[in-house]
Amino acid sequence: MPFPNCSAPSTVVATAVGVLLGLECGLGLLGNAVALWTFLFRVRVWKPYAVYLLNLALADLLLAACLPFLAAFYLSLQAWHLGRVGCWALHFLLDLSRSVGMAFLAAVALDRYLRVVHPRLKVNLLSPQAALGVSGLVWLLMVALTCPGLLISEAAQNSTRCHSFYSRADGSFSIIWQEALSCLQFVLPFGLIVFCNAGIIRALQKRLREPEKQPKLQRAQALVTLVVVLFALCFLPCFLARVLMHIFQNLGSCRALCAVAHTSDVTGSLTYLHSVLNPVVYCFSSPTFRSSYRRVFHTLRGKGQAAEPPDFNPRDSYS
């Protein structure tokens, strides 16, 4: 919370957030582990699109692996037991994995937009090896952007507190940097995703006018709409809560600030939900992933492996 002397952690809010984080951890680890296995062992023909999705799965898997520590933090009413270094490491990995995930979501949207709307551009000839190089640069850039804001993540003198990501009022460089970066991390990817997906839909509507092609158009529309809705659902509430936090910091109302701080805790935990929902997008976009998740689902239900659909092609690719 931004002002420890103004409000104490809410037991109800902390417990709810801790339980939600625990669920996100379990589902995120399972879904993204299956996605990673599918990428490594079942996708045979690689394109840049698949490389970016692989990196997205890695970022989501890293994020999900960090969530047990954050869940324990909330379930213990925000008491921290892993020291200053542990606090720094948790903040770094959470912020990095979330930033990288958002960057690769934008990269996927841009790649699809260029291939569908501007298919003759030379950038569409990018090889998988070049896409790996681009992915490495994205990771390095996000590391460089994440580090300056980590000065905020310092434990208290007794090493039993680990300040949250949410804004505080001291106006230091690290606070300003982190808030500006958080704003850009939402606005830029969201704007790019909306723009690219709208362009894809317009292009497909012009090309798929025949009645027999309408089912393909409808599937494409559903997929791009799903991507936009999931992004907004997970990140927009947290973005708005941070805006409200800045507003109420200047009003001097401790009660209002407490309510907004608790809202920030809840909406902040929702941003990690995207690591759980991204595998839904994989499943929606490829029969290979539908087959993998179907196998896991039937195994968990004790029914053994599901039969492959008649039109299943194990040499699936992303074009």
Curated annotation (Swiss-Prot):
<dbReference type="InterPro" id="IPR051893">
    <property type="entry name" value="HCARs"/>
</dbReference>
<feature type="glycosylation site" description="N-linked (GlcNAc...) asparagine">
    <location>
        <position position="5"/>
    </location>
</feature>
<feature type="topological domain" description="Extracellular">
    <location>
        <begin position="241"/>
        <end position="265"/>
    </location>
</feature>
<feature type="topological domain" description="Extracellular">
    <location>
        <begin position="74"/>
        <end position="91"/>
    </location>
</feature>
<feature type="topological domain" description="Cytoplasmic">
    <location>
        <begin position="202"/>
        <end position="219"/>
    </location>
</feature>
<keyword id="KW-0812">Transmembrane</keyword>
<feature type="topological domain" description="Extracellular">
    <location>
        <begin position="1"/>
        <end position="16"/>
    </location>
</feature>
<keyword id="KW-0443">Lipid metabolism</keyword>
<dbReference type="GO" id="GO:0050728">
    <property type="term" value="P:negative regulation of inflammatory response"/>
</dbReference>
<protein>
    <recommendedName>
        <fullName>12-(S)-hydroxy-5,8,10,14-eicosatetraenoic acid receptor</fullName>
    </recommendedName>
</protein>
<dbReference type="GO" id="GO:0006629">
    <property type="term" value="P:lipid metabolic process"/>
</dbReference>
<dbReference type="Pfam" id="PF00001">
    <property type="entry name" value="7tm_1"/>
</dbReference>
<keyword id="KW-0297">G-protein coupled receptor</keyword>
<dbReference type="GO" id="GO:0002931">
    <property type="term" value="P:response to ischemia"/>
</dbReference>
<feature type="transmembrane region" description="Helical; Name=7">
    <location>
        <begin position="266"/>
        <end position="284"/>
    </location>
</feature>
<dbReference type="GO" id="GO:0050778">
    <property type="term" value="P:positive regulation of immune response"/>
</dbReference>
<comment type="subunit">
    <text>Interacts with KRAS; in a farnesylation-dependent manner.</text>
</comment>
<feature type="transmembrane region" description="Helical; Name=6">
    <location>
        <begin position="220"/>
        <end position="240"/>
    </location>
</feature>
<feature type="transmembrane region" description="Helical; Name=1">
    <location>
        <begin position="17"/>
        <end position="37"/>
    </location>
</feature>
<feature type="topological domain" description="Cytoplasmic">
    <location>
        <begin position="285"/>
        <end position="319"/>
    </location>
</feature>
<keyword id="KW-0675">Receptor</keyword>
<feature type="transmembrane region" description="Helical; Name=2">
    <location>
        <begin position="53"/>
        <end position="73"/>
    </location>
</feature>
<keyword id="KW-0472">Membrane</keyword>
<feature type="topological domain" description="Cytoplasmic">
    <location>
        <begin position="38"/>
        <end position="52"/>
    </location>
</feature>
<keyword id="KW-1003">Cell membrane</keyword>
<comment type="function">
    <text>High-affinity receptor for 12-(S)-hydroxy-5,8,10,14-eicosatetraenoic acid (12-S-HETE), with much lower affinities for other HETE isomers. 12-S-HETE is a eicosanoid, a 12-lipoxygenase (ALOX12) metabolite of arachidonic acid, involved in many physiologic and pathologic processes. 12-S-HETE-binding leads to activation of ERK1/2 (MAPK3/MAPK1), MEK, and NF-kappa-B pathways leading to cell growth.</text>
</comment>
<keyword id="KW-0807">Transducer</keyword>
<dbReference type="InterPro" id="IPR017452">
    <property type="entry name" value="GPCR_Rhodpsn_7TM"/>
</dbReference>
<comment type="function">
    <text>Proton-sensing G protein-coupled receptor.</text>
</comment>
<feature type="topological domain" description="Cytoplasmic">
    <location>
        <begin position="111"/>
        <end position="131"/>
    </location>
</feature>
<dbReference type="GO" id="GO:0045125">
    <property type="term" value="F:bioactive lipid receptor activity"/>
</dbReference>
<feature type="transmembrane region" description="Helical; Name=5">
    <location>
        <begin position="181"/>
        <end position="201"/>
    </location>
</feature>
<dbReference type="GO" id="GO:0050544">
    <property type="term" value="F:arachidonate binding"/>
</dbReference>
<feature type="transmembrane region" description="Helical; Name=3">
    <location>
        <begin position="92"/>
        <end position="110"/>
    </location>
</feature>
<feature type="topological domain" description="Extracellular">
    <location>
        <begin position="153"/>
        <end position="180"/>
    </location>
</feature>
<dbReference type="GO" id="GO:0007186">
    <property type="term" value="P:G protein-coupled receptor signaling pathway"/>
</dbReference>
<keyword id="KW-1133">Transmembrane helix</keyword>
<comment type="similarity">
    <text>Belongs to the G-protein coupled receptor 1 family.</text>
</comment>
<dbReference type="GO" id="GO:0010447">
    <property type="term" value="P:response to acidic pH"/>
</dbReference>
<dbReference type="GO" id="GO:0004930">
    <property type="term" value="F:G protein-coupled receptor activity"/>
</dbReference>
<dbReference type="GO" id="GO:0005886">
    <property type="term" value="C:plasma membrane"/>
</dbReference>
<keyword id="KW-0325">Glycoprotein</keyword>
